[in-house]
Amino acid sequence: MSKGEKVGKERRRYPRLQGLYLLSYINKERGVQKTGVSMARTINISPVGVGVEVYEAINRDSVMEMEIAVRDIVYAVQGKVIHSQEKSSGNYVIGIQFDQVQKELGKKL
C-alpha cells in the first residue's frame, strides 16, 4: 500500500490513513513518567488517533505526550493508549486515542 492509502473497508468518522511519520514520545502511567524521550514511527494516523510501532512494552491507559512530524510541521499532541500488541519481532504496536481532535493535522494528511 502506498502512503495515504486507506486501510481496509473504513467505517470510522475519521478514517485512518497509512503513513510513515516519525514521532517522539514520553510515556506516563498514573502521572509518573515511565520513560525518557523515546522515538517511534507511525503505522497509521487520523485526526483522532495514531497507530505506532515502539520497541518497548507500553501499558494500556498510559498517557502519551508526543510530537509528530508531518511534512514540514511538528504537532504536539497528547493521548491515551487504548491497545497494545506484541509483534513476533519483539516490537509492539500500540493504538493511541488523542485527547482532542487534531483538525489541523487532519488537513496535512
Regions found by a protein language model. Give the residues of each.
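Short, Lys/Arg- and Gly-enriched loop/turn segments at beta-strand edges
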Residues: D72-Q78
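N-terminal helix initiation/capping motif
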Residues: M1-I45
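Short, surface-exposed secondary-structure edge patches
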Residues: Y14, E53-A57, I73
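Residue-level recognition of beta-strand microenvironments
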Residues: I26, I45, S84-Q85, V101
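Conserved hydrophobic positions within beta-strands
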Residues: T42, G79-V81
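Short solvent-exposed strand/turn elements
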Residues: S24, R60, Y92-L109
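Short strand-loop-strand
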Residues: I26-D61, E65, G95
